[in-house]
Amino acid sequence: MSTIRVDVVSAEQSIFSGEAKFVALPGESGELGILRGHTPLITRIRPGSVRIEKADGDEEFVFVAGGYLEVQPDRVTVLADTAIRGHDLDEAKAIEAKKRAEEAMQNRGTDFDMALAQSEFAMAAAQLAAIARFRRKK
């Protein structure tokens, strides 16, 4: 099977750079699966898990907190707002963040920002889903 070049980068660092057989990630309108020869595409990505099936058959998981995806027939570039390797995700922090967001949505104060609380909740839920996926593949 032919491979495609994959680069996952955040503002802080390069998270993954290498050859892959397949890449799956959460696009703005749904889950995307990318193989070599894919039609060129630029789209926003939602918070969630990027699954990279590497050329050697191993899988790599990266959590992204949104960003942009560029696909060329021989290259995939993920420009993430924040990117964290699957094994570096902190479940306790994600659970606490989700709990804080839920409490904020229930206890609306005068300076309450519903959009911010919903965004934080979605981010924490996406991190927990990514952690669950990463654990299943171990």
UniProtKB/Swiss-Prot annotation:
CDD domains, per database record: F1-ATPase_delta
Gene Ontology MF, one: ATP binding
InterPro entries: ATP_F1_dsu/esu_C_sf, ATP_synth_F1_dsu/esu, ATP_synth_F1_dsu/esu_N, ATP_synth_F1_esu_C, ATPsynth_dsu/esu_N
Cellular component annotations (GO), alphabetically ordered: plasma membrane; proton-transporting ATP synthase complex
Keywords recorded for this protein, A-Z: ATP synthesis, Cell membrane, CF(1), Hydrogen ion transport, Ion transport, Membrane, Transport
Subcellular location: Cell membrane
Role this protein plays: Produces ATP from ADP in the presence of a proton gradient across the membrane.
SUBUNIT field: F-type ATPases have 2 components, CF(1) - the catalytic core - and CF(0) - the membrane proton channel. CF(1) has five subunits: alpha(3), beta(3), gamma(1), delta(1), epsilon(1). CF(0) has three main subunits: a, b and c.
Protein name: ATP synthase epsilon chain
Organism: Polynucleobacter asymbioticus (strain DSM 18221 / CIP 109841 / QLW-P1DMWA-1) (Polynucleobacter necessarius subsp. asymbioticus)
